Every structure is written in C-alpha cells, then in structure tokens.
Amino acid sequence: MRIGWALLALSACGGPIARSPGDAGSVASPDASVVPPEDGGVPQADAGVVSRGPTLAGCPVFPPDNAWNRDVSSEPVDSHSADYLAFMGASSLYLQPDFGGQYGQPFVVVPADQARVPMSFLYASQSEPGPYPFPRDLPIQANEDRHATVLVRDECRIYETYNTYASGSGFHADSGAIFDLASGAPRPDGWTSATAAGLPILPGLARYDEAVDQGEIRHALAFIAGGTAHAYVAPATHSSGSTNATYAPPMGLRVRLRADFDLSRFNGASLVILRALQRYGMFVTDSAGGQFWSVAGAQDSRWSITDLDQLKTVPASAFEVVRLGAVHSGQ
C-alpha cells in the first residue's frame, strides 16, 4: 500500500487528536532475565531461560514463538542477500524513522464493552465483517494510507483498517482485519489486511513504552520499502507488488542489522531499537514509490526527535537478509 509523509494524526471527525501516555494501556515491566550489555551489543538472555514475548495493555502481542517475536540473530543469511539489498538501494540509503511526537501510527486501547459500529469495505471478500469496536473519535493515521488500529483490552484482539473514513453511524475502509493476539493466527493465504502484506500493524511498531520505559523491544519491527515483488513469504499472506524483477523483495522479507555494526555511538531509544533490529530484524510489510527504508512506529508525544534522528545515520548497507522460506506468487 501507499505511504505519504504526514505531520498530524487526525480523528475520524477531521480534527487533531491528543493522546496521553496512559492511552496505550498498562504494560508489564521488562523481563528480568534479559540483561542489557555494557558494550552496546545485543542483550543476552540468561542461559536456559526463554524470554517471554511482548505485552500491551495486559495482552500478549502474539505468543513468544511467533515469527514476530522469534530471535533470528543466529539464523542463516539468505544466499541472495546482496542482490535483494542492491535492488532496495541499500548502498545509498539510510533508515528513516516514520514516527515521532506528531506523526506515525496512532492506536487506541478500548474496553471490551466498547460500542460496536457498522463497517463497510471495498475489499469485503478479504475483510472480516463488522461491527468493529471503533470509537467516534477514532485516531486515524494522517497520511494517504489512513490506517486505524484498535486494541480491545481483555478480548486481546486488534482491529485494523486501511483507508478509513467515518461513514454514517460507522466507518468505511478499503480493507479490515482482526488479529487474535493470544493465538497469533495469520490471515488466510492470499488475503490482504490493513497492510499490503496481510500482516498486522500494531505488533511491528516501535513503541515508546518499550523503547524508553522498558528499555527493551522484544519483537521485530515493520518497514516500508520502495518497490516490491509480486510475491510474498511467510509470515506475509499477500502482496500488491509493483514488479517481477528477480530480486525485488517479496512481502514478508526480513532484514536484520548485522551483528558487527558498531552501536557504541548510539544511546537512548535509538540504541534500544537498533538492538532489536539485530536480534529480531524487521519485515517488509508495505511498499511505496521511490527508494527508502521507512521504519514503522507509534505516534507518541514523548518521543525525542533528537534521539530518533540517530537512526537516520544507520546505512541500509548495514543490514542483511535473513534466509527466506518458500516464496509464493502475489495476489
């Protein structure tokens, strides 16, 4: 799907929406079994301890063994890693954090008794039907994608839509998807979601509560690449790629920051994000025209732009492609 740079998160009624730090829900404290290293490298879990997966508002954000939460720091590099990186312009591009205090992906946590409203979808055959628990002041991403993400507390499901607009007593969107955070079940093969990859939005966001409050991100991130193939690899289930080029990245391709990339000059949230990229990597979940590596994150007024600007000094050439699984033709 498409991306447009934006400066404000808009409500469904068209005005700016403010979110306090508490709106993201309660988050469990960091896993005591994981000790941040002194040298800026990837933190190591205690021997024999399986680190638990991420949580948000009392909900697991997929099981610990889900693809999003799997440590891939020791997995093999794909034999065509250099070819994929060359197609993605890695030799001349740098990371671009697509989030901050005034832009990024907003989301809201609602109670289980949140009123459900009717939904209509352009791609109804690949969308879970309504009603959805969308509040009237639903925060909507302020770019041309107009993504919306709602987490229902206790139910532990996320409801996500693409190209979202208020319509009558409910909302209209191009597509809608519901993900069960406890099971981590993927979309049916060939189905889209609020992203072109059929993947969820919320689990792939860099969030302030993790990067700063907890000091650790225990999952992969999502990024948008310029130009993708008509193909996808698990955990993706769909593609809307623009090319049949041999080494165009399929949706679901995972890159990770190389272990030998020196992190000693980084600090704060940026250091935490880079450690996560070494351990869990990031998935291609969407595409856009041009060439860039746009890392997804939650809009949060507490982000320090000075801190996040450190990410812009990380060259895309410092990444490598984790070995791909079976490649499926796109939808």
Predicted regions and their residues:
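Short, surface-exposed polybasic-aromatic patches that bind anionic ligands, especially phosphate groups
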Residues: 48-331
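Ser/Thr-rich, Pro/Gly/Ala-heavy low-complexity intrinsically disordered linkers and tails
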Residues: 1-51
